[in-house]
Amino acid sequence: LWRLGDRRSADERLADIEATRNIPDVQDAAILYRELFQDPRATSLSDSRPESLNGSVFNQRLYEPWRSEEAPELARFIEKHRYIIDKLLEASALDECRFPLTTDITAVLSEVDYASMRQWAFLLGFAANNDVAEGRLGDATARWRCLLQMGHHLRQRPVLLDFIVADGIQTIGLKRLIRFVVAEESTETNLKRIEAMPLPTADAWTENLRDIRMADDLPVQKMMEQWSPTERLKYRFYAYRFNKATGGLLNKSTSEDKAAQSYFRTMALARGLRIIIALKRHRTEIGHWPESMDEIAALLPEPILMDPLNEGPFVYRRTIGAFELYSTGANKIDEQGRGESEGSDDWPIWIPPAPAPPSRNGQDPIMNELKAIYGERYITRPRADANAP
């Protein structure tokens, strides 16, 4: 038997699952995404993206406000593809999304164009930052909400890669929202809009993983139904030997562990955003950031204060005129907020950006004099920090 006590074929099991997922087309955001999947222009954004978006400029435009005159090529690129943004906003107005499941092992990953959805996420991020710089905060928050809703839509199909891509898309929106709340002019109206967004703060990983495994079994079962009992035994034997020889290359649990880490890191950002909104309200009312999270704990549901990566508290630390907020990661060791890029396990929620380097245009006489005395490498002019009280 494929499953003890379950004699249904893969197609019968799939039909039962899809019956529980069925919704009217007018409620299904997947219909709108599919229209974009079938548009060659919408699925080739990376080919037409401005060449100026190289290296650090890409992240700068994705996470910081910019004006059209600063990046005219990018502004024209956004305007040319505004119809994609409009279609994504239309999809984001729907809560339900039903990308189909399948028993065809060759088609599992072809129902969703992951690469295009990632490119659309970048497009939304670029456009939102242009909106912020030019005073269109309502448009910016709509685009950030759209990023979160895209992730919410993807997670409604129990496929591991859908969850991983969802995390990546939502992370763009969450990181940008955190910066907006902390370091920019976020009003109470903006904070309420953000709180109303589909923030992924609830832990449903156990239920999600159960559904993912069930859907994951279907294509394999369908394939093995066409084999003789001997061929099925051979498949299991060779799969076991290959997995052992390659150190778990095909080990499903390894992929699940990575997906779980991504899921909980995204959740940590979402919970961190809720905490930061409470911190910002305290700063607006009192005039400075709290000395500890005890001052705002009563304003938040208890689960929001829990770090999902280790089920302990987040680290909140006041600095000079600012603060740091981060997870100590699965190892529960406080490594001062340093993340994977620095060889550590911490997961930063908000670490104030480093001061800008000194001007090199030679127009600052005081800085030039200091350089002459001490040498340029020792001179740093601190940048005004909007995170300060």
Regions found by a protein language model. Give the residues of each.
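Short acidic linear motifs
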Residues: 1-389
